[in-house]
């Protein structure tokens, strides 16, 4: 009994290997995506100086309270970090100093040209001086102008911010001696430049900040412990920055411009949290050389797709990375948590919902990046390509492509390398296939696109069936892809937000549906018109499609520096080799002439048989075998006369001949020796073309191994990242149609490797997928889209009219669900709710908040709602006085226990905040008619702002003359341009309160957390949870 080929192109092996190969890659990739590597034991820890237990303890301490910049808890967290920094240095017995004047440096607006970088092979002695210097910034401030701000106001605006950053300088062996930052105000290159490691220690007012950005902060403490341990002094100096004020406008990074270390740091690693756990992804990098620093990460995770998403504007969330690169010109990496977004900026961004594994992932990967950067000299110093002298002299980098493989390997190549690869494929792959096609044609073995062939000129043409199966693949692909996309759009229309909590249910539906529809069409066509060329034609179509896509990928890489098309380079490479195998299969076939000749001979034999006078003529004329033949036993149908056929047919061959003698044409023509080998001869599969019997039946397996693994790996990793990053974007007002379209598209791409072989799959596989499809379809259509683990985010703010002593509560979110939430709140039940369109799909729903008036810090106990109108009279004070000039006004502004106020003027003004460093030349943009909005931040809530304000009216006012300038002639220019105006100045002041740590301070927020459904998450709508507004007039 013959053993079946386990790799044969038949139903059993094809079904088995399709399941095995897809399961072998889909399951691990999903597992890697959903899990986080375990913290290694002490014996296996690649960085023994990193103490995850200690870091976790620090994290639990700083996340006990909400700690936004505008809160008392924020000051406590800053003090805790200063205490921990000194404890680590004392423990490691490190010589350190503390700088009192840690900021306020005003740099020239144009830097000097940086000297050429030092030669890498030059030996120099170790830098001398204190090993560590601590900078506690309590004096820096920045003032800048623009056209949009943290309050999303329209028109020109001004911002004044006071910094409270904490910096630690770790001396490198290549750094200059001593305290080189003292007494130097020229921005020349210091040594080989330094590495900046940044994280922000403020949280949002509605979240504890465990991953945003507590893990980044405690990672910095452990990095400090690593580099201050004996034997670990870095080569290039390292600056550890714990900045404050990131959440409401990247202010902490912006005020770093006034640090004495500003021009020293030329490369950076930014640690951020845009999610609430999981793995920390390499979000983006500036160039190839910097990315190589991440190459040694123990568990690399990320690809260039995220960076291109920022570049194209598809991802709008910004981090301090934007300041370091766009404003300062540094080169570095952005490492951040990005999922689950449903917990981001909510009270579930805490240690209960985080893990030590996530902390270890960020900590170990970031230290690996920092370590590689501090060892790298010569790349991150020198003149810039853009020639911008306001920016750091960080040299220039190369565009790159990068991606991880299974969370363990990391691949990097130059973008021009990708361009060369794709361009080579575009040229070489069709030429190679054309060459093989030419050789096959010369050998007369190119069966594709061949209808008929003749052996000789006088013979009738023989059908080859070379066109059978040509149109099946595009028809099946278009129809199955269309139905798959339509199913995703159906879910979007009926239950659009199910993707929020159940993305894998949508994945299962689209994957099963595409396979099911494609199998039905391909299998049906194969049954009706069997063709041995169906697999080959599928490869030809795949080659054409991937080649066309690769043209776009190549153009994007060359013209727009977009590297995200790299998966299609892999895909086309695999398709090219697989298509080449399909062509090479034809070399095993007889030539078409030979096939036609054999077919013609067989036909002649059939004709001769049909013309014989009686059955005796059927006896072979080969006399050497006649004697061996044994006469058949007579039966009832045996003729009475030997010369007569049964049934009185008079020698005519009828259809009953085959039934009577059961002897085929091949049996008649075979010798007994040939008859013995009959069972071993290859036969065409299931009525396919006769010539296909000689096609290799095992090459399909190698084609599957070429196509499936690489396609699944590169595309599924990207698909899982994209869907995880945007599947909950509906809470931000974005239409989820993009998520559904992405899932449908990636489902099609992931299953494309199976399409050339799908018609040989067993009926039971699509039958099972049919069940999967119906179950997931019903679930996706009827299930409630949110859950306690995947909460819908709504945005909260309470607005006080301090003049009228009234309150309005605003809940912003998806209107259908926001109304359900408000109906369950004690203060909102039964009240009229007015909803107006907000951003995207969201609505701003408002109701009267008189029942839950805030008990702001000056009140020690709750007051009844019907108190006198002066309840909040002294909450915000604005004292306005005129100076000697008839148009110049002095504003004295204070707000009880608030660090931020916003002034909205009815007419454009120029302004100067007392004690400011002047207009920042980096962040300011020229304004045409002054500013109408002014945002003021202060580090000490007990010190009022004093602002000089003057109404102006001019056609064009340069940015530098709207406020105090460090240039001596700025005042004269200002006098020349302004138009004095003695009329009254009016407007509105709005101050913010963000501290909800004491229960009862903001009762409306407390009840939103307590009484909302468990599928609702409450986050901040603006800087403050409470905004108090009042009018002013001078």
Swiss-Prot record:
GO terms for biological process: proteolysis. Glycans are attached at residues 51, 141, 805, 866, 879. It is found in: Vacuole membrane. Zn(2+) 2 binds at residues 212, 247, 345. Its cofactor is Zn(2+). The active site is at residue 246. Its EC number is 3.4.-.-. Residues 1-11, 440-470, 519-536, 589-703, 758-762 are cytoplasmic. It comes from the Eukaryota. This is Vacuolar membrane protease. It comes from Colletotrichum graminicola (strain M1.001 / M2 / FGSC 10212) (Maize anthracnose fungus).
């Amino acid at each position: 009994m013959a053993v079946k080929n386990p790799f044969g192109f038949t139903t059993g092996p094809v079904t088995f290997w399709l399941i095995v190969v897809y399961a072998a890659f889909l399951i691990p990739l999903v597992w890697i995506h959903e899990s986080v590597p375990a913290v290694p034991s002490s014996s296996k820890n690649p960085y023994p100086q990193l103490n995850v237990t200690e870091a976790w303890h620090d994290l639990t301490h700083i996340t006990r309270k909400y700690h936004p910049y505008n809160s008392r808890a924020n000051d406590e967290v800053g003090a805790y970090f200063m205490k921990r920094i000194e404890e680590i240095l004392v423990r490691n017995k490190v010589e350190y100093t503390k700088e009192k004047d840690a900021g306020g440096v005003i740099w020239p607006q144009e830097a000097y040209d940086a000297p050429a970088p030092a030669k890498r092979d030059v030996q120099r002695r170790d830098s001398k001086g204190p090993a560590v210097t601590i900078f506690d910034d309590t004096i820096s401030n920045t003032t800048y102008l623009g056209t949009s701000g943290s309050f999303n106001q329209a028109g020109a605006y001004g911002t004044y911010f006071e910094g409270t950053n904490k910096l630690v300088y770790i001396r490198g062996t290549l750094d200059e001696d001593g305290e080189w930052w003292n007494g130097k105000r020229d921005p020349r290159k210091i040594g080989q430049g330094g590495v900046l490691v940044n994280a922000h220690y403020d949280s949002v007012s509605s979240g504890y900040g465990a991953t945003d950005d507590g893990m980044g902060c405690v990672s910095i403490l452990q990095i400090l412990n690593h580099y201050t341990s004996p034997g670990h002094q870095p080569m290039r100096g390292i600056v550890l920055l714990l900045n404050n004020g990131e959440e409401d406008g990247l202010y902490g990074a912006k005020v770093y411009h006034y640090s004495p270390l500003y021009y020293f740091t030329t490369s950076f690693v930014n640690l951020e949290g845009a999610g609430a756990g999981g793995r920390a992804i390499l979000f983006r990098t500036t160039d190839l050389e910097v990315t190589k620093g991440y190459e040694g990460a123990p568990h690399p995770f990320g690809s260039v797709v995220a960076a291109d998403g920022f570049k194209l504007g598809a991802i709008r969330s910004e981090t301090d990375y934007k300041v370091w690169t766009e404003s300062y010109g540094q080169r570095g990496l952005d490492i951040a948590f990005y999922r689950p977004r449903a917990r981001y900026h909510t009270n579930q961004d805490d240690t209960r919902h985080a893990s030590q594994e996530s902390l270890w992932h960020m900590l170990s990967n970031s230290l690996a990046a920092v370590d590689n950067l501090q060892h790298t000299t010569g790349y991150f110093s020198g003149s810039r390509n853009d020639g911008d002298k306001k920016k750091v002299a960080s040299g220039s980098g190369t565009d790159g492509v990068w991606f991880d493989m299974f969370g363990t390997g990391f691949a990097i190549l130059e973008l021009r390398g990708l361009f060369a690869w794709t361009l080579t494929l575009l040229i070489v792959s069709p030429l190679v296939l054309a060459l093989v096609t030419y050789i096959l044609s010369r050998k007369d073995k190119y069966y594709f696109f061949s209808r008929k062939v003749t052996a000789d000129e006088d013979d009738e043409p023989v059908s080859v069936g070379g066109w059978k199966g040509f149109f099946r693949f595009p028809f099946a692909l278009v129809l199955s892809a269309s139905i798959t996309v339509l199913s995703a759009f159906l879910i979007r229309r009926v239950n659009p937000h199910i993707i929020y909590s159940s993305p894998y249910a949508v994945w299962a539906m689209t994957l099963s549906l595409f396979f099911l529809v494609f199998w039905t069409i391909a299998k049906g066509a194969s049954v009706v018109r069997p063709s041995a060329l169906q697999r080959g034609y599928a490869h030809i179509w795949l080659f054409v499609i991937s080649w066309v896509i690769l043209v776009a990928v190549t153009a994007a890489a060359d013209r727009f520096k977009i590297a995200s098309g790299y998966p299609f380079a892999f895909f086309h490479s695999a398709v090219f080799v697989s298509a080449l195998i399909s062509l090479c299969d034809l070399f095993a076939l007889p030539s078409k002439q030979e096939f036609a000749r054999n077919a013609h001979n067989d036909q002649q034999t059939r004709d001769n048989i049909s013309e014989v006078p009686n059955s005796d003529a059927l006896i072979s004329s080969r006399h050497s075998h006649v004697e061996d033949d044994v006469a058949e036993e007579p039966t009832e149908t045996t003729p009475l006369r030997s010369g007569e056929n049964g049934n009185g047919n008079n020698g005519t061959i009828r259809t009953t001949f085959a039934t009577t003698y059961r002897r085929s044409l091949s049996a008649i023509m075979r010798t007994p020796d040939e008859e013995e080998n009959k069972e071993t001869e290859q036969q065409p599969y299931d009525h396919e073309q006769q010539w296909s019997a000689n096609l290799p039946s095992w090459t399909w397996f190698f084609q599957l191994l070429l196509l499936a693994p690489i396609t699944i790996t590169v595309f599924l990793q990207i698909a899982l990242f994209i869907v995880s990053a945007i599947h909950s974007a509906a809470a931000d007002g974005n239409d989820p149609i993009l998520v559904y379209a992405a899932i449908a598209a990636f489902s099609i791409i992931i299953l494309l490797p199976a399409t050339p072989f799908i018609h040989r799959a067993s009926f039971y596989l699509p039958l099972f997928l049919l069940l999967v499809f119906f179950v997931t379809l019903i679930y996706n259509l009827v299930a409630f889209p949110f859950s306690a683990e995947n909460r819908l985010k709504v945005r909260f703010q309470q607005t006080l009219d301090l003049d009228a002593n009234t309150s309005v509560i605003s809940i912003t979110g998806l209107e259908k669900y926001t109304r359900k939430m408000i109906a369950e709140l004690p203060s909102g039940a039964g009240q009229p709710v007015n909803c107006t369109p907000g951003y995207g799909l969201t609505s701003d729903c408002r109701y009267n908040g008189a029942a839950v008036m805030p008990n702001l810090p000056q009140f020690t106990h709750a007051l009844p709602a019907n108190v006198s109108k002066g309840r909040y009279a002294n909450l915000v004070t604005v004292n306005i006085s005129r100076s000697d000039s008839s148009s110049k006004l002095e504003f004295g502004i204070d707000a009880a226990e608030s660090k931020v106020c916003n002034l909205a003027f009815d007419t454009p003004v120029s302004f100067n905040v007392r004690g400011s460093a002047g207009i920042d030349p980096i962040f300011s943009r020229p304004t045409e008619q002054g500013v109408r909005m002014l945002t003021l931040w202060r580090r000490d809530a007990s010190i009022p702002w004093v602002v000089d304000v003057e109404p102006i009216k001019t056609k064009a006012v340069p940015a530098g003359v709207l406020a105090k300038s460090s240039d001596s002639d700025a005042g004269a220019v200002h006098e020349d341009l302004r138009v004095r105006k003695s009329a009254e100045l009016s407007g509105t002041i709005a101050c913010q309160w963000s501290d909800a740590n004491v229960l009862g301070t903001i009762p409306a927020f407390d009840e939103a957390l307590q009484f909302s459904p468990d599928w609702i998450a409450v986050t901040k709508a603006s800087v403050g949870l409470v905004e108090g507004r009042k009018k002013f007039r001078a």
